[in-house]
Amino acid sequence: MGQIRVPRKGVTPSELANVLSRRLGGGFEVAADDGTVIVRRSPLSAAVVRIRNAPGATVFRVRGAGVPLVSLGTSRAVADALRKSPEFRGV
């Protein structure tokens, strides 16, 4: 799905998981792991978000996991939620 760069440094996986849980709603299962957040819509559809720090920003890399066509919708929903999230606009 691509990369989303937000102008906020030091976003943690647990913080990202909390924001995605609120933004995506009850139809998604969100779990944080070491530097990665996994978002599942169904057993066949998931998105993996990796967190990378950049100078003055945080970069989220969103990729689909599972059945390709089904995962595309999940990864797109995650990427849209990240882009529209006011929590990551800056401190």
PLM ranges: what are they?
Residues L24-G25, V49, G56-F60, V78-L82:
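Short, low-complexity, polar/charged sequence segments that are solvent-exposed and flexible
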